[in-house]
Amino acid sequence: MVKVYTPRRLREKNRWLRSDGKPNFKDRLYSREPELSPLIRRDVPPINTLTTVLRTCELMSSQNTRLIAVTSGKGNIIGVITAMDIVDYLGGGSRHGLVSVSGFETIHEVLNLNVGKIMSENPIYVNINTPLHKVLELMINYGLGAVPVSSEDDIYAGVLTELEIMKYLSVKYVGIPVHKVMTREVLSVNSSTSLEEAMWMMISLGVRRLPVIDHNELKGMLTWKNIIDLIGTHKIYEILRYGLLREFKSLRVSDIMTTDVDIISPDADLSEVASAILRAATSSLLVVEEGVVVGIITERDVIYGLVVS
């Protein structure tokens, strides 16, 4: 019997909400609540509907961001494109149907598509004057890892990410161990899993990262960034012999995974997680006990652990 998983983003939402559908924020969030302006990333440029998927991947890779706003000619936010939208389009989900309908066979054709055809329209975004607790409430309710921010006159101003929020909220000692907030159900692949299957798992199960485990031994980690970097750095053109989409989807996880995986103990303090994530420039850590992967902890887990009762 096949187990049907609830996408992680939905489990996370339910985990941190009260019965009335609102998060129960700790007093420390209100006492330290800042203006959004110092927290937003202004270095992530917007794109327009005619920007190609390739150019979008280049920006995501170079700017280390998984969300880019799509703006109108006047600078208003009209859509967003995320790394997972691109993974979906490349073979992970419903957006891939556009490839079949268009008859694309080469990776060049696939990556030359305008993002306007796969972006999310009418996106959730916040005004620069929105209180942080309201932003967090939105992020929790909708499972968002980043949101575009508009200026007072509704012009794109930047992006607010979980990483920037975590940086602000981090303190020297929290007193909450990793095992209290980590996700225990770790979905994994093996090193011979095809990229097509791994992308399908990411989209259908609502995860952005998959540990790679062979015979109970941790071999690496496959993340959205591995896929985006493969394209954004143009390495994809070096490893595909004929430049065909089917070659790309047939790649093995081991061809692009990260082998140097950052780990942490289940008894470590949340503050140690924040420090390790910032130091390693990653978005998650695997939780390992006596050589066995027992969980995973992300920027989102740290934030919620810090501010939600």
Describe every region a protein language model picked out:
Residues 1-309:
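Tandem CBS (Cystathionine beta-synthase) repeat/Bateman regulatory domains
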